[in-house]
């Protein structure tokens, strides 16, 4: 039997990291067991669902490298099918019309609140006669369709992450609403729990992997599966992603959408790598930097933690920096060029750009760090106070004069790393000036401060861009 998993996002907002991690776990498990990864867009919330959010979700999945195996389906295209299954439940007596008004429901909840009871429908219209139904309809009352839930029933299933889960029928909030309100004998638009069951069955889904906030929905859906004589999939409920305070990560925590992570300068490979370990503790991994293919080979749902997973910026930043350090210079330059173009910076050659990428990548945490790291190589920086103080030293000024004179006298030399070292050594020995003074003086001239990337490699780049002398001259 073919193994089939799905991601079923609602397009009511930007692609969220919680949904992205659910997608990743589904994709990884599908790869591990040789199954298929499918997409279903749950867009039956017509007021909040937007096509641009659907597009954003699919683009985010592509960016993360999570390819789906079949054309995505939209739940809104299947409303008539959902209604036909509601009709079946009505005909077999598993569901009924409920004419309780919104005001009556509010009154019931208020009474329950006063008594300290949880909100729960009283199923008052479960046994209406045909005459009573016709009376309500003639009065212009609208009805929802409710699914009967036996309060004495115990729903049990084996969760691949949490083991056996039990849920009491009496704790499910009363008979379940399957459809929105409609007039007469019409059936309103289907609601989440009914549509999910019908569509998972239609798609032949064998494994449902989703967040722990769906556990109560699973209990309700199992009852619908059984009433419709559908085969049950295997369920797995992943832990929530928590913020630093141990609360569910939300938009209030600032960055939550995949777009925002991309714009901040995180690589898709790094974000996927981090998300895989967010709630999963593999027993067989001997390192933390792994490709999606490597992760899929060792991924095991049973090793996912039950407790919530705290989001760590520090860990994500470290993983991202490792990916940048190990990235091929040509690929990194391709990415960095987008930032350079935005600032109007043009490297003198591709080779020069490759050398710069190799020089600064070890200092980068985010891709956008390339802006600050690259800037001194395109624009001559202002000399900072500590640099100005250092240049007040007589030996510092002398060092720069001697280096400049050498460059002028040897105008025909092509300066590379070896030649740069030779110049420093020769001047130091000939004029009895410490190498440290010479190099610090150059660093101030090049970067405007006493800190910066490798000086010798930087000098080679400044020489190639023909700005090394200009930078030295401004300090004299």
Curated annotation (Swiss-Prot):
Q: Which residues cross the membrane?
A: none
Q: Which InterPro entries match?
A: aa-tRNA-synth_I_cd-bd, aa-tRNA-synth_I_codon-bd_sub2, aa-tRNA-synth_I_CS, aa_tRNA-synth_I_cd-bd_sf, Glu-tRNA-ligase_bac/mito, Glu-tRNA-synth_I_codon-bd_sub1, Glu/Gln-tRNA-synth, Glu/Gln-tRNA-synth_Ib_cat-dom
Q: Which terms in the Gene Ontology molecular function aspect does this entry carry?
A: ATP binding; glutamate-tRNA ligase activity; tRNA binding; zinc ion binding
Q: According to its UniProt entry, what is the function of this protein?
A: Catalyzes the attachment of glutamate to tRNA(Glu) in a two-step reaction: glutamate is first activated by ATP to form Glu-AMP and then transferred to the acceptor end of tRNA(Glu).
Q: Which principal EC class is assigned to this enzyme?
A: ligase
Report the residue ranges where the short sequence motif 'KMSKS' region is annotated in this entry. Answer: 248-252
Q: Where does ATP bind?
A: 251
Coiled-coil segments on the chain, per record: none
Gene Ontology biological-process entries: glutamyl-tRNA aminoacylation
- Tell me which family the UniProt entry assigns to this protein: Belongs to the class-I aminoacyl-tRNA synthetase family. Glutamate--tRNA ligase type 1 subfamily.
Residues spanned by motif 'HIGH' region: 9-19
Tell me the superkingdom of the source.
Answer: Bacteria
Organism lineage: Bacteria, Bacillati, Cyanobacteriota, Cyanophyceae, Synechococcales
Q: What is this protein called?
A: Glutamate--tRNA ligase
Location(s), subcellular = Cytoplasm
Which Pfam families does this one have?
A: Anticodon_2, tRNA-synt_1c
Assigned keywords, A-Z: Aminoacyl-tRNA synthetase, ATP-binding, Cytoplasm, Ligase, Nucleotide-binding, Protein biosynthesis
This protein's assembly is summarised as: Monomer.
PANTHER family recorded: GLUTAMATE--TRNA LIGASE, GLUTAMATE--TRNA LIGASE, MITOCHONDRIAL-RELATED
């Amino acid at each position: 039997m073919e193994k089939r998993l799905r991601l079923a996002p609602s397009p009511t907002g930007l692609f969220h990291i919680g949904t992205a991690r659910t997608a990743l776990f589904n994709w990884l498990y599908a790869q591990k067991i040789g199954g298929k990864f499918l997409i279903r867009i749950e867009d039956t919330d017509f007021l909040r669902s937007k096509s641009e959010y659907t597009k954003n979700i699919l683009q985010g999945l592509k960016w993360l490298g999570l390819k789906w195996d079949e054309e995505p389906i939209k739940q809104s295209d299947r409303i008539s099918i959902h209604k036909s299954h509601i009709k079946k439940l009505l005909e077999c007596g598993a569901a009924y019309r409920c004419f309780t008004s919104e005001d009556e429901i509010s009154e019931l909840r208020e009474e329950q609140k006063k008594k300290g009871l949880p909100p729960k429908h009283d199923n008052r219209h479960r046994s209406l006669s045909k005459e009573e139904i016709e009376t309500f309809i003639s009065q212009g009352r609208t009805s929802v369709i409710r699914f009967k839930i036996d309060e004495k029933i115990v729903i049990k299933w084996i969760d691949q992450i949490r083991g056996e889960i039990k849920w009491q029928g009496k704790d499910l909030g009363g008979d379940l609403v399957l459809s929105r309100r409609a007039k007469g004998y019409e059936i309103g638009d289907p609601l989440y729990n009914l549509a999910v069951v019908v569509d998972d069955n239609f798609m032949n889904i064998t494994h449902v992997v989703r967040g722990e906030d769906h556990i109560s929905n699973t209990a309700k859906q199992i009852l619908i599966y059984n009433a419709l004589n559908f085969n049950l999939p295997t369920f797995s409920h992943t832990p929530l992603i928590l913020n630093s305070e141990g609360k569910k990560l939300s938009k209030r925590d600032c960055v939550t959408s995949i777009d925002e992570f991309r714009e901040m300068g995180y690589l898709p490979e790094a974000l996927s790598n981090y998300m895989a370990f967010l709630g999963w503790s593999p027993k067989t991994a001997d390192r933390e930097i792994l490709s999606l293919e490597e992760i899929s080979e060792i991924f095991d749902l049973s090793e996912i933690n039950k407790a919530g997973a705290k989001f760590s910026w520090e860990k994500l930043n470290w993983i991202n920096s490792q990916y940048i350090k190990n990235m091929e210079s040509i690929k990194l330059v391709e990415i960095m060029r987008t930032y350079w173009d935005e600032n109007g910076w043009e490297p003198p050659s591709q080779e020069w750009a490759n050398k710069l990428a190799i020089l600064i990548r070890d200092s980068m945490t985010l891709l956008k760090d390339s802006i600050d790291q690259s800037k001194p190589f395109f624009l001559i920086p202002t000399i900072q106070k500590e640099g100005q103080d250092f240049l007040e030293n007589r030996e510092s000024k002398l060092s720069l004069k001697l280096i400049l004179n050498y460059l002028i006298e040897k105008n025909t030399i092509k300066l590379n790393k070896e030649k740069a070292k030779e110049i420093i050594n020769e001047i130091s020995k000939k004029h009895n000036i410490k190498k440290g003074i010479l190099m610090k003086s150059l660093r101030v001239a090049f970067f405007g401060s006493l800190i910066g990337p490798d000086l010798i490699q930087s000098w080679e780049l400044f020489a190639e861009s023909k700005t090394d002398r200009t930078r030295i001259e401004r300090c004299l």
